[in-house]
Structures are given as C-alpha cells and as structure tokens.
Design a protein with these regions (language model features):
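Acidic donor-binding segment of Leloir-type glycosyltransferases
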Residues: 1-14, 18
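Active-site nucleotide-sugar/metal-binding loop of Leloir-type enzymes
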Residues: 7, 26-36
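Glycine-centered loop/turn positions within well-structured domains
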Residues: 19, 35, 114
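Catalytic-site signature of metal-activated, phosphate-bearing donor transferases
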Residues: 22-29, 40, 46-189
Length: 190
C-alpha cells in the first residue's frame, strides 16, 4: 500500500513499529495537512458509487464540528458469523457470502485535540468526548476485505491477541479490554 500511495503522489512517512496502533495512527495525524481526516486501512475502501455522497458530507458547512461514525462491512466466508448479513448485490464490491457490521468514528476534522487511544482496537471516541465534539452518523459504508484471507486473518488475530494482553495488563479494570481479549482468544482457540 505504501507503493500505491507513492504512485498516486501521496507523501509517505515511516515510523518504527512500537506494538501500538494508536502511536502509528497519531503519527499519521501529526502529518496530515488537510481539513478532514478519513481513516482507512489498506484492505478497506469506499465504493466509487458513494464518492459524491462522501464529498457532499465533508463539503457541508457546519456551525459546530462533528465527527462521523461510519459502518464497516466486514466481509466473510463463514455462514456462522454472528450478525451476518447476506450480500444482496447492492455494491459491486461485496465479497464472500456476506458481512457483519461494526461502527466507529473514521471521519473527523483535523483537530489536534483528536487523537487515538489504545494499542489495539484504537479509537478516537474518548478524545472526541473530552473535546465536546459530537458524533454524527454517516450512511456511506466502508468495505473491509481483510477477513476474506484466512492465513492473514489467523496471523493478525494472534498478533491482536498479544496486543490485547498488553492492553489488559495496562488497565486491568477495563471491561472493554477484557471483552476484546476474550473474543481474540476464542478466535485463535485459546
């Protein structure tokens, strides 16, 4: 993805990996120069059919800042996935047999108060709450294909489990960290 970004003229910065996704994300935020931040991973995309809706959303004048929670369609090959919604052909990008939803803030104004927290399953929501920035919803989905590749998914799940253990060790009273670790552990069969 680094090479693809360079091919399209993007400025590409490198950072040493510190076993903490929030550090890497915050480094990228520090390099951003536009008015808006849109968080997207290499195995994710927005459908071209939604580009105009997306442009209209960020082009709207607003009296007060708003961050947008966006639904991610996590495509899967497994029929027993909790919350599975079968593909309907609504999007050409659909993969696998269906998808399960997850929502998180991915679009927000470039504001130094907004930073990611947590070494794994990193979020900006706590920073938004602290800054008093409301969260609005967006009806443009992000299409996530990472769960379609079994070998990579297993490797990633193991890595996330290790990071989850570190996260829980840092805050032993965090029910969210305990829940995330339980899910990751179940996925790797431990």
């Amino acid at each position: 993805s680094r090479e693809i970004a360079k091919a399209f003229g993007a400025r590409v910065f490198e950072i040493a990996w510190e076993d903490d996704f929030s550090i890497a994300r915050n480094f990228s935020l520090s390099k951003a120069s536009g008015n808006w931040i849109f968080v997207l991973d290499a195995d994710e995309m927005v459908s071209p059919k939604d580009y105009d809706k997306f442009r209209a959303l960020i082009g709207r004048p607003s009296a007060e800042p708003c961050a947008y929670s966006i639904q991610t369609r996590n495509y899967t090959l497994h029929a027993n996935t909790v919350g599975l919604k079968l593909n309907t052909g609504e999007y050409a990008e659909e993969g696998g047999i269906g998808w399960f939803p997850s929502d998180k803030v991915r679009l927000f104004r470039n504001d130094s108060r907004i930073r990611f927290v947590n070494p794994v399953h990193e979020l900006v929501e706590p920073a938004l709450k602290e800054a008093g920035i409301p969260i609005c919803s967006c009806d443009v989905p992000v299409h996530h294909f990472g769960k379609l590749y079994e070998a990579k998914t297993q490797e990633k799940t193991e890595a996330y489990r290790d990071l989850g253990k570190k996260k829980l060790k840092k805050d032993r009273r965090s029910l969210a960290a305990l829940r995330e670790l339980a899910i990751q552990s179940a996925q790797v069969g431990r």
